[in-house]
């Protein structure tokens, strides 16, 4: 890991003055990539000549500030709760570009919920010179889901080589290091042209595991409330997102009584009691509210539930003493508290229908259970999130996934929030996570447009 970090940093910063940490912004013109005359001959390369193809693809990446930064970020493993290496690299990179950079440590929670200070993860807040309270802020997350997948380049088999078709694969290439790289370069481009309008960069940890990074920033002095525009980065296929669904998560824990499987009536199977409960839970998004279901809306469609994890018992010849299931809910309407009430009633009704004397309780999961069946709601819960999408030239959509948008407490009136980024969510978190050079560079242009629109607001 250390070798990877050093190589990435040296390759990107060899020509930079690393000691210039918080001065007037560098006015040197940027080389951010795009079409280049030196690559006009690439179309004549035989795409089946692997060695030559790899060499030319590497040249394309190395010739572009955007593509080189993206590669360096992706090559550094940064699975949630272990973002220190990529954070250190990004801080040094921003220092070298004459940003002032602040490091904000983000606590962990121990099993009892007590916060623990650690230097393994931290947010990064950067701005030009002394402009610590800019009106425009670009933000993305630097953590990824597991497992780590190395950076690689490929090109589709075709009669000719096309620069835009180079496929960049690896964990984080889309979610969310594409947005991180684009936002950095877009900010540098803006400051080169408009040094009188400061812009901030916020890169947070732990977005993939509950949003603790953004919540920490939101509750700190750095959240000054002087901003008028916040641009969040996520893979949106370069569309502006007009909003996304809300989120509720919960765990069901059933306590049974163990016995020999040859005499099941001497025990009580936790697995057998869990099954009818999950059957009822699984249909809550498909039935109307009048029948005990969860709400839907015209904008976001129906509420969906995913039973993502289930375990129970110890062996086939033992009546199961315990069963556990974890469920994620994507709310299409209503508020989280009402949704929790609906979910709890459904679980209780299913449990008592299966066994009349079943006791169902809401629990924090830490204390000794007071019932046969515990319902443990996660700490993260929010309703639908409406977002601005009023900039011309973009497709507009809604998405079903969660983001850091609801974790940022907004202070002040008329603050615009945009959600945008290159790449598609349909490959994020998958083995095939990837995007093309053309998609990444088009994403940068979209960020430039959003920043320019925000700058107009500041002038007015």
Curated annotation (Swiss-Prot):
InterPro entries: Bact_exopeptidase_dim_dom (IPR036264), Peptidase_M20 (IPR002933), Peptidase_M20_dimer (IPR011650), Peptidase_M20A (IPR050072). The active site is at 207 (proton acceptor). Zn(2+) 1 binds at residues 175, 208. GO terms for molecular function: metal ion binding; peptidase activity. Zn(2+) 2 binds at residue 175. Glycans are attached at residues 98, 395. Its EC number is 3.4.17.-. Keywords: Glycoprotein, Hydrolase, Metal-binding, Protease, Secreted, Signal, Zinc. Belongs to the peptidase M20A family. GO terms for biological process: proteolysis. Pfam families: M20_dimer (PF07687), Peptidase_M20 (PF01546). This is Probable carboxypeptidase ARB_01041. Binds 2 Zn(2+) ions per subunit.
